[in-house]
């Protein structure tokens, strides 16, 4: 065996090659720390693998913010997240990093973000119309095309990491803790993304992946929204996850994929993969979801959920798909009328301070997938008694 066949991204391949080293060399990044006394924690919003997330108040201007207190992980990983957030700041639909503070006692870093009045996705996704799905998918694509153009893969695209303020039709792509700089020919860790959204490349242990990983995850989100099946590929473990995919996309194309890249499949798959035909997308349509499905939706989905990462649409190609024609037309009309609401990043003043325009923001839904720590008061900030009570 000569090893796997190398692969390079079809777009934005050499972005980081043409940037100065300090752009992508996050290990050398010097973090500028803000003042932790500027923030008062209000209540806990959620916890994840790598962090705890709180709603807080910036007491210098009385604005709501979100504070993500990082668990003690490798300094390198924290620096990577910070550098990526700083590089992407101001980009369309990218969550804005407003400040970085550190508790002087515990030395635990905390990231301060603009506040988004989020609706929990499990409730929201059941209420979205066909147009809503197109609209929000297009908004995610703006964020993905931007980060890809900046040489960055998100690597954890999933509903929990998409904050939607439905009332204001505002969307933000959050949690850049697993994001990484793309360098052609580099082999990456396949232990990224959440199981239901892991691309086949991760499941077959192909390490030379690229931005197209995010497009698979987006395809999984689209399928779950239009078919009202959450998650769409429901594997019980990483091996079963590939089996669930093969039962839809078929085993023939899977074997073509592993042959093309000379991938050696884990012997554990021998007993569980079986032989499956490729299913037509129409078979997932029923009376409860047919109002969300159209020929262009199925065509778009088909062009995202491909085994071969090089065959998937890029974010920019996806934005040009007929599925988005109505959204593009509406946004063009609104921007010519000077009112392109949710389609553009909020003003930089608003970004730095959180969204002040919402008079009485309702509570953020739990950030269930967010990265987290045990010490509720690790910022050394007085926390109201109820702050840790609400999950």
Curated annotation (Swiss-Prot):
Top-tier EC class: transferase
PTM entry text: Phosphorylated at Thr-344, Thr-360, Ser-362 and Ser-370 by CDK1 in prophase and metaphase and dephosphorylated during anaphase. Phosphorylation does not directly affect casein kinase 2 activity, but may contribute to its regulation by forming binding sites for interacting proteins and/or targeting it to different compartments.
Cellular component GO terms, alphabetical: chromatin; cytosol; nucleus; PcG protein complex; PML body; protein kinase CK2 complex; Sin3-type complex
Residues making up the signal peptide according to the UniProt record: none
Compartments where found: Nucleus
Modified residues (Phosphothreonine): 344, 360
Residues passing through the membrane, by range: none
Keywords from the UniProt entry: Apoptosis, ATP-binding, Biological rhythms, Cell cycle, Kinase, Nucleotide-binding, Nucleus, Phosphoprotein, Serine/threonine-protein kinase, Transcription, Transcription regulation, Transferase, Wnt signaling pathway
Reaction(s) catalysed (UniProt annotation): L-seryl-[protein] + ATP = O-phospho-L-seryl-[protein] + ADP + H(+); L-threonyl-[protein] + ATP = O-phospho-L-threonyl-[protein] + ADP + H(+)
Miscellaneous: Can use both ATP and GTP as phosphoryl donors. Phosphorylation by casein kinase 2 has been estimated to represent up to one quarter of the eukaryotic phosphoproteome.
Protein family (similarity comment): Belongs to the protein kinase superfamily. Ser/Thr protein kinase family. CK2 subfamily.
Main function: Catalytic subunit of a constitutively active serine/threonine-protein kinase complex that phosphorylates a large number of substrates containing acidic residues C-terminal to the phosphorylated serine or threonine. Regulates numerous cellular processes, such as cell cycle progression, apoptosis and transcription, as well as viral infection. May act as a regulatory node which integrates and coordinates numerous signals leading to an appropriate cellular response.
Protein name: Casein kinase II subunit alpha
Gene from which the chain derives: Csnk2a1
């Amino acid at each position: 065996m000569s090893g796997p066949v190398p692969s390079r991204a079809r777009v934005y391949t050499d972005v980081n090659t043409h940037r100065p080293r300090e752009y992508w060399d996050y290990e050398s990044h010097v973090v500028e720390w803000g003042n932790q006394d500027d923030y008062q924690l209000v209540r806990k919003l959620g916890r994840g693998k790598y962090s705890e997330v709180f709603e807080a108040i910036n007491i210098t201007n009385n604005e709501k913010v979100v504070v993500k207190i990082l668990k003690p992980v490798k300094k390198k990983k924290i620096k990577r997240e910070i550098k990526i957030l700083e590089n992407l700041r101001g980009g369309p639909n990218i969550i804005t990093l407003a400040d970085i503070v550190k508790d002087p006692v515990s030395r635990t870093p905390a990231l301060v973000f603009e506040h988004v009045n989020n609706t929990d996705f499990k409730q929201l996704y059941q209420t979205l119309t066909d147009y809503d799905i197109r609209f929000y998918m297009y908004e995610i694509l703006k964020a993905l095309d931007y980060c890809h153009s900046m040489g960055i893969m998100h690597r954890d695209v999933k509903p929990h990491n998409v904050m939607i303020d439905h009332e204001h039709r505002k969307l933000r792509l959050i949690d850049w803790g697993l994001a990484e700089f793309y360098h052609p020919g580099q082999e990456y860790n396949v232990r990224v993304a959440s199981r239901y959204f892991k691309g086949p490349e991760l499941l077959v242990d192909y390490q030379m992946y690229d931005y197209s990983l995010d497009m698979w995850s987006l395809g999984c989100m689209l399928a779950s929204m239009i078919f009202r099946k959450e998650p769409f590929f429901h594997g019980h473990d990483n091996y079963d996850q590939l089996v669930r995919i093969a039962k839809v996309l078929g085993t023939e194309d899977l074997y073509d994929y592993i042959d093309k890249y000379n991938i050696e499949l884990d012997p554990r798959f021998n007993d569980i993969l079986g032989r499956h035909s490729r299913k037509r997308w129409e078979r997932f349509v029923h009376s409860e979801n047919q109002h969300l499905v159209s020929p262009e939706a199925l065509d778009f989905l088909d062009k995202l959920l491909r085994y071969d990462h090089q065959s998937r649409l890029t974010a920019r190609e996806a934005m040009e798909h007929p599925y988005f024609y109505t959204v593009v037309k509406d946004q063009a009309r609104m921007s010519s009328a000077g009112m392109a609401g949710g389609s553009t990043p909020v003003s930089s003043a608003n970004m730095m301070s959180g969204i002040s325009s919402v008079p009485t923001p309702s509570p953020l839904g739990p950030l269930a997938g967010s990265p987290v720590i045990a010490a509720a008061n690790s910022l050394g900030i007085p926390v109201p008694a109820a702050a840790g009570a609400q999950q």
